[in-house]
């Protein structure tokens, strides 16, 4: 399967053959894509939420009032969960939200996400992702030629420093080396731009 190679000026400069098993899967499995995105988002959660229990909250251990004769319900501590300023029962604890997902499913998710973008006409192959200077204004003008609202840019094994620096201040534009290609960013950005090197490395990686 062949597709156009574009320059950063959005002009056709050649053709490239793409592996249909990676970029043109016939039946897109949205369930797999969602499964991988859920796995990614859960793994990214910090999980540092925490409340103090009765044993951790600050306060006296003295009995509030005597056991009998006051007419009140008996109390043993001012730090109990029912007391104002007391501990919290069954509150959130520091934990990892990460779940396990087989590598084969993760690989399938990436393949189906790339295929979905290609089917939409939103996956473009660029001849080179290199800039002479790390100028944000230059990169903004380049991206405007593609008429997209957000871009996920995937380069080869290494990212051009000038391109990376220029993209840092651009809203909804992310550039990563091929190892950083992931389902969540592919789906949430309108356009996916791949360098020629990224295509060959991804095909080798996902074969």
Curated annotation (Swiss-Prot):
Keyword RNA-binding appears in the UniProt entry: yes
Biological process, per Gene Ontology: translation
A cellular component term, taken from the record's GO annotations: ribonucleoprotein complex
Pfam families for this protein: Ribosomal_L4
Keyword Zinc annotated: no
Keywords (A to Z) from UniProt: Ribonucleoprotein, Ribosomal protein, RNA-binding, rRNA-binding
SUPFAM superfamilies xref list: Ribosomal protein L4
Stretch list, region Disordered: 50-75
InterPro entries reported for this sequence: Ribosomal_uL4, Ribosomal_uL4-like, Ribosomal_uL4_dom_sf
A molecular function (GO) term: rRNA binding
Record-stated family: Belongs to the universal ribosomal protein uL4 family.
Function: One of the primary rRNA binding proteins, this protein initially binds near the 5'-end of the 23S rRNA. It is important during the early stages of 50S assembly. It makes multiple contacts with different domains of the 23S rRNA in the assembled 50S subunit and ribosome. Forms part of the polypeptide exit tunnel.
Subunit structure: Part of the 50S ribosomal subunit.
Protein name per Swiss-Prot or TrEMBL: Large ribosomal subunit protein uL4
Species whose genome carries this gene: Rickettsia felis (strain ATCC VR-1525 / URRWXCal2)
